[in-house]
Swiss-Prot record:
One of its GO terms (molecular function) is threonine-type endopeptidase activity. It comes from Mus platythrix (Flat-haired mouse). Encoded in the MHC class II region. Its EC number is 3.4.25.1. Keywords: Acetylation, Cytoplasm, Hydrolase, Immunity, Nucleus, Protease, Proteasome, Threonine protease, Zymogen. This is Proteasome subunit beta type-9. It is an enzyme of class 3 (hydrolase). GO terms for cellular component: cytosol; nucleoplasm; proteasome core complex; proteasome core complex, beta-subunit complex; spermatoproteasome complex.
Length: 219
């Protein structure tokens, strides 16, 4: 028997599916690390526990998705299509800055219709590893950036823990710790952690399962 006020199967149909999220990207000398949690929710329901929020835009360029799952993926798909054409016209891979500008322009053009925030990160021969935030049509390069609902819980940690000149392994550890802390505090973040490391050598994908996440004293 359903109790009063309990969500029903039909009630979830009107709820927009959100990647209530923690996303992050960090530059290091020679590349970038991009990471995210994997929980997707619709209202009070978790509709996907292992959704990969790191979407490829080109060979060595990825974006991290947050906001409405459909809107964020639509922006990523449109950007990937434009960058594929851009690369064919130039006969060389597009620059990370070009990819970030494409995402920024799409986000701004459809700002009244789409609810999404994407972080663009990757490697190119001109500038090496780069991280760009694109919220609301803004474009800014940063040594690291965070986003999503879980990010509000970890600003203090990332500001204190970030050190210029970190290695790729230190950046992976930094990203893993930050996302784990956000998952512990934010009810909309959870699941596993996806990590992508992008360098001149290629793209390295890793998945950190729940029983492999770092432990903190407050757990």
């Amino acid at each position: 028997m359903l109790r009063a006020g309990a969500p029903t199967a039909g009630s979830f149909r009107t709820k927009e599916v959100h990647t209530g999220t923690t996303i992050m990207a960090v530059e290091f000398d020679g590349g970038v690390v991009v990471g995210s949690d994997s929980r997707v929710s619709a209202g009070e329901a978790v509709v996907n526990r292992v959704f990969d929020k790191l979407s490829p835009l080109h060979q060595r360029i990825f974006c991290a998705l947050s906001g409405s799952a459909a809107d964020a993926q639509a922006i990523a798909d449109m950007a990937a299509y434009q960058l594929e054409l851009h690369g064919l016209e130039l006969e060389e891979p597009p620059l990370v800055l070009a990819a970030a500008n494409v995402v920024k322009n799409i986000s701004y053009k459809y700002r009244e219709d789409l609810l999404a925030h994407l972080i663009v990160a990757g490697w190119d021969q001109r500038e090496g590893g780069q991280v760009y935030g694109t919220m609301g049509g803004m474009l800014i390069r940063q040594p690291f950036t965070i986003g999503g609902s879980g990010s509000s819980y970890i600003y203090g940690y990332v500001d204190a823990a970030y050190k210029p000149g970190m290695t790729s392994e230190e950046c992976r550890r930094f990203t893993t710790n930050a996302i784990t802390l956000a998952m512990n505090r934010d009810g909309s973040s959870g699941g596993v952690i996806y990590l992508v490391t992008i360098t001149v050598a290629g793209v390295d994908h890793r998945v950190i399962l729940g029983d492999e996440l770092p432990k903190f004293y407050d757990e």
